[in-house]
Amino acid sequence: MKILGIETTCDETAAAVVTVGEEERGRILSNEVLSQIAEHAAYGGVVPEIAARAHVEVLDRLIARALQRAGTTLPEIDGIAVAAGPGLIGGVLIGLVTAKTLALVARKPLLAVNHLEAHALTPRLTDGLAFPYLLLLASGGHTQLVAVKGVGDYVRLGTTIDDAIGEAFDKVAKLLGLGYPGGPEVERQAQNGNPERFALPRPMLGRRQADFSLSGLKTALRIEAERLEPLASQDVADLCASFQAAVVDVVVDRVRVALRAFAGVAGHPTALVAAGGVAANGAIRRALAAQAGEVGLSFVAPPLPLCGDNGAMIAWAGLERLRLGLVDDLTVPARARWPFAEAAPAA
């Protein structure tokens, strides 16, 4: 079984072909990604109109390249998976219309994938992970702790009440005059900084629910930065290190709460998983691995190229759905918002 995956929900244009190898393990035959960082850098963030136009310009060629590098052709593909949301609606529409056209012309099943679900299922592609597992899904637009019980069966244990983790990193980078994208720049600066110089708050620590709040942390950093202006290079590094250390502490505390809640909705987890762009952050990965070890769990995070948006995760989610007979018709809509996990019942 071979699935073509198409991803256009934000500022990466991606296409990939995924299959199932020995012992039903996933295998990536090709994974083509074109980033739009250069197009958006001058604006300090993603401009939806620019993103949509960039998708239009390259998507057809990228799909052709993905098929070629996979050593296959469209008639040999068993299904066409596409991220139908959530995301910037212009980009989502471009990917979805392209996938619908290919499915119609080639007479292949259309598999409309939730972009967040694709992140959630990535460890099954990379590590063959069994259900259920606890997922920290953290990106520029989303931060959630989810009990992943099965394909299409997700229980949200916690979410952010304001900024997503990746969004907070990006805003801090912009405030400090760092480059775009902000997350990697903050992490790079933090490597040369003192994480104990600034006593930044750890919002929500000790709360019974597994929710996040990062706006107060971001405000506290801004106050410190304004107090020190003009900022020396060491000031910037120390601010980044202190901010990152605070985020790590918050993440670990929230994960502890979610682990306690997990048993009530899904039994015993097979692993602690991090996915999404923020899962590429080394400090967060190390802290989560240590936390998992403390409670006797393995820690799983995708290889760095699969943390960000990519076509392989879309293709894999489509493959998982196709194996269950979950096929979509050509009227499936594009969605700017598309929650993928139900909230856990109130305690």
Curated annotation (Swiss-Prot):
EC top class, as a word: transferase
GO BP annotations listed: tRNA threonylcarbamoyladenosine modification
Compartment annotation: Cytoplasm
Keywords from the UniProt entry: Acyltransferase, Cytoplasm, Iron, Metal-binding, Transferase, tRNA processing
Record-listed Fe cation binding positions: 115, 119, 309
One GO cellular component term: cytoplasm
Cofactor: Fe(2+)
Catalytic activity: L-threonylcarbamoyladenylate + adenosine(37) in tRNA = N(6)-L-threonylcarbamoyladenosine(37) in tRNA + AMP + H(+)
Summary of the function given for this chain in its UniProt record: Required for the formation of a threonylcarbamoyl group on adenosine at position 37 (t(6)A37) in tRNAs that read codons beginning with adenine. Is involved in the transfer of the threonylcarbamoyl moiety of threonylcarbamoyl-AMP (TC-AMP) to the N6 group of A37, together with TsaE and TsaB. TsaD likely plays a direct catalytic role in this reaction.
Name of the protein this chain belongs to: tRNA N6-adenosine threonylcarbamoyltransferase
